[in-house]
């Protein structure tokens, strides 16, 4: 289960129609090649690289870079990280098409499609602190009993939550973060005062 330690995770991006189409195409190619798990692993590693690097986040989101600059940088990153084959070519194509901004959504969509194909649900979990293996197991079991399906979790760490976690499964979100509770309390106090 991939874990990225970051104060500004990009993996929580909403999934757009563009991201869904790209992810669906990548999934079909991976399924035909029998490499869905390998592709998922490479995508998870690339997402962790995005989450951990402000420079890579800028490359992915900034329109200031040309498609040639983005494609060249992505090719170098893929070579260095040994992300080749299907995912390497996919990322280079996405860069050439000036769609790098949608990569986090594409990765999230791929995870959902792959989980659905396996009869599972994909859950994006953002925690204020790294979860222990026991906490991960307990959360996975709680989500399984709530949904009735096996759950694959993708965990990121966001210290700005202060405490608690945010769990996203499809269009549903459960936010038990201390940051949200404090914001709610602040609004309630403004209404009273």
UniProtKB/Swiss-Prot annotation:
Membrane topology: Peripheral membrane protein
Cellular compartments annotated: Cell inner membrane
Keyword hit for Secreted: no
InterPro entries: ATP_synth_OSCP/delta_N_sf, ATPase_OSCP/d_CS, ATPase_OSCP/dsu
Main location: membrane
Keywords noted in UniProt: ATP synthesis, Cell inner membrane, Cell membrane, CF(1), Hydrogen ion transport, Ion transport, Membrane, Transport
Entry's Gene Ontology molecular function annotations: proton-transporting ATP synthase activity, rotational mechanism
GO CC terms, sorted: plasma membrane; proton-transporting ATP synthase complex
Keyword Lipoprotein tagged: no
UniProt cross-references to PANTHER family, sorted A to Z: ATP SYNTHASE DELTA CHAIN
Role noted for this protein: F(1)F(0) ATP synthase produces ATP from ADP in the presence of a proton or sodium gradient. F-type ATPases consist of two structural domains, F(1) containing the extramembraneous catalytic core and F(0) containing the membrane proton channel, linked together by a central stalk and a peripheral stalk. During catalysis, ATP synthesis in the catalytic domain of F(1) is coupled via a rotary mechanism of the central stalk subunits to proton translocation. This protein is part of the stalk that links CF(0) to CF(1). It either transmits conformational changes from CF(0) to CF(1) or is implicated in proton conduction.
NCBIfam families, alphabetized: ATP_synt_delta (TIGR01145), PRK05758.2-2 (NF004402), PRK05758.3-2 (NF004406)
Family according to the record: Belongs to the ATPase delta chain family.
Subunit annotation: F-type ATPases have 2 components, F(1) - the catalytic core - and F(0) - the membrane proton channel. F(1) has five subunits: alpha(3), beta(3), gamma(1), delta(1), epsilon(1). F(0) has three main subunits: a(1), b(2) and c(10-14). The alpha and beta chains form an alternating ring which encloses part of the gamma chain. F(1) is attached to F(0) by a central stalk formed by the gamma and epsilon chains, while a peripheral stalk is formed by the delta and b chains.
Protein name (record): ATP synthase subunit delta
UniProt source species: Allorhizobium ampelinum (strain ATCC BAA-846 / DSM 112012 / S4) (Agrobacterium vitis (strain S4))
Lineage of origin: Bacteria, Pseudomonadati, Pseudomonadota, Alphaproteobacteria, Hyphomicrobiales
Gene encoding the protein: atpH
């Amino acid at each position: 289960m991939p874990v990225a330690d970051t104060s500004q995770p990009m993996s929580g991006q909403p999934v757009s129609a563009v991201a869904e189409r790209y992810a669906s195409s990548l999934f079909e190619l991976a399924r035909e090649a029998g490499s869905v798990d390998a592709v998922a692993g490479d995508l998870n590693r690339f997402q962790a690289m995005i989450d951990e690097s402000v420079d890579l986040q800028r490359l992915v989101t900034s329109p200031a870079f040309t498609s040639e600059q983005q494609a060249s940088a992505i090719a170098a990153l893929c070579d260095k990280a040994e992300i080749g084959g299907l995912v390497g070519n996919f990322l280079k194509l996405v860069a050439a098409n000036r769609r790098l901004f949608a990569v986090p959504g594409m990765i999230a969509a791929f995870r959902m499609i792959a989980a659905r194909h396996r009869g599972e649900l994909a859950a994006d979990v953002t925690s204020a602190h790294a979860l222990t293996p026991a906490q991960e197991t307990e959360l996975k079991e709680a989500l399984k009993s709530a949904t009735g399906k096996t759950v694959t979790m993708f965990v990121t760490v966001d210290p700005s939550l202060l405490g608690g976690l945010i769990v996203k499964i499809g269009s549903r979100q459960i936010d038990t973060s201390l940051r949200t509770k404090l914001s709610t309390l602040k609004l309630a106090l403004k209404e009273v005062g």
